[in-house]
């Protein structure tokens, strides 16, 4: 998926939160090209970052981008499915960030041709209501977060309140909604409480 300007808000919020944490581990899940995790690594010299991506072609791009940005000493990539419970061998992360597929399946045919024809469906399709990945990540990946770890999501138009509820139901608190440059609620983040 080609990074969009909206994603800058997500990366900035993550970097701001992690900057005060000192040495930390960050997981960029549904990493796509890896732009969010790589931006974090470039701005946070004490961070170790894992780019987790399901699609093999996107994973190749992640690896190329790690090398191009000369971040091989602090950034790794791994094939991970956000819909499946992670292996305990991954360890714990202080921050989990994700810009998952969030377009409702029925809306994909009506997307602008520049998106519909040039982006992999796998990177767009969030299930019937567009929220499948948010549910899966909150339910299955919360154990990959350290105590008081933080979860950051980019969300689609009109999804922020629903994602907030999903997070709250799964033990996250101090949940914030942040608007993008067009004044649209675009980022939802919170802290693991239990």
Identify what each model region corresponds to.
Residues 14, 40, 115, 137, ...:
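Class I S-adenosylmethionine-dependent transferase superfamily signal
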